[in-house]
A protein has these predicted regions:
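Single-stranded RNA-binding regions, centering on S1/OB-family and related RNA-binding modules
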Residues: 3-181
Length: 181
């Protein structure tokens, strides 16, 4: 989703050179300040655009930088608990698989893949059922439900997202098309 937002950026003193407009720097500074982070509603900001300064900036005594309110458009990646998502397996390890959903990685624990017990072959990058021919590997497209969501606002790469495929209509997209789902 795209949202109109307002926030404040810090424009360091070295950006205020004679003959240069602050508008030239606002785009780059706003992108650096906001992109690749979670907002206050735990939505991941992918891209910002149309940065417009609002009013005059403020200078804090002893700092020397300008603190400027900026209005901008933000393209957000939103996730909710129990939402059904699609992604591709990016890594297989002894406890399950990591699934790439948008800009984030989520864990699909081996106990949440099939009702059957599974065997993990880390070397081959596969997870397969013991009693059936169902198999997942790196690059396999899956549909899963988010069962736990703990965004880390200080470092989005450390966010914890848990998935399950143990419900009807979930699992490998290949399995689902074979079953007519």
């Amino acid at each position: 989703c795209i949202r109109d937002r307002e926030d404040t950026i810090r424009i360091p003193a070295e950006y205020m050179k004679k003959g240069q407009s602050l508008d030239q720097h606002i785009d780059r500074l706003a992108m650096t300040a906001f992109e690749g982070r979670f907002d206050e509603q735990n939505r991941f900001i992918l891209v910002t655009s149309n940065h417009t300064p609002l009013g005059r900036g403020r200078i804090i005594h002893g700092d020397g930088a300008i603190y400027q309110r900026v209005r901008f458009d933000a393209l957000l990646f939103c996730m909710d608990d129990y939402e059904v998502v699609e992604g591709a397996i990016s890594e297989v390890n002894e406890f399950g698989a990591f699934v790439r959903i948008g800009p984030m990685e989520a864990l699909l624990h081996k106990s949440q893949i099939l009702d059957d017990q599974v065997e993990v072959n880390v070397g081959a990058g596969t997870i397969s059922g013991r009693n059936d021919d169902k198999r997942l590997g790196i690059g396999t497209a899956v549909r899963a439900r988010i069962v736990s969501l703990s965004p880390d606002t200080s470092d989005p790469r450390r966010s914890k997202i848990g998935l399950t495929c143990k419900q009807p209509g979930l699992g490998s997209l290949e399995w689902l098309s074979e079953a007519g789902e």
